Amino acid sequence: AEDLCMAVSQSGETADTLAALREARKSGARVMALTNVVGSSMARETEGNVLFTWAGPEIAVASTKAYITQVEMMLLIAVDLGRKRGVLSPQRAQQMLTDLAALPEQAKRVLELAGEAQRFASRHFDRKHVFYIGRGLDWALAMEASLKLKEVSYIFSEAYAAGELKHGTIALIEEGSLVCALLTQRTLAEKTLSNIREVKSRGAHVLVICPEDLCEQARTVADEMWLIPNVPCLLYTSPSPRDPKTS
């Protein structure tokens, strides 16, 4: 079989993911699982083709460490596949691994924003809806952030690809709407800034979350701004505060 199907599930028991895995196997694809639970259905049904995240029990309703370890594991898989296929140089691969190992220290700096986040929540806790926007990798982050807000605060929230705002989404933005804009993709920064200007023109209150090297550009459009450390763009999807040497 030339196709590989990777099933990702914290519990290893997610019914629809299991069904998709079984269907892929029936179709002749090789299957593997990425899960947090040893002895789960996915671990058994992939017959040893399984990678465990070893995140420990997930207690919170909103997935935190399980999600983070899944993203990190998939990044490591991508780096290794890139090296083996010859599309990623050994030097570039090593640099990505070095950057990933340094990420816990960078994440600790982000945790210092806790007080600022609490004050932000105190100002906006009575919002009826919150929108998240971003481009590229930032859209994936926006979807996860929106999910976390819904699960924890029960505030209606949706995430949208910033480039698709004009296709109906912009009509939902009204005076006083809270929009959280993620701006970490440097090559897409100008386009995202243009989208932020669009929502501001409709009266939105905008929080921009961006790295330090984009703060001057973001300052021109943001009502509020949180600065995060400068790291390679791909690593913004993997916000681990853990030390990979000890966990």
What residues fall within each predicted segment?
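Active-site phosphate/pyrophosphate-binding segments
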Residues: 48-178
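Glycine-rich phosphate-binding loops that contact phosphosugars or nucleotide phosphates
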Residues: 1-95, 99-102, 182-231
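Conserved small/polar residues in nucleotide/adenosyl-binding loops
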Residues: 236-241
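Extended hydrophobic-aromatic, low-complexity segments
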Residues: 14-18, 119-120, 140-144, 151-152, ...
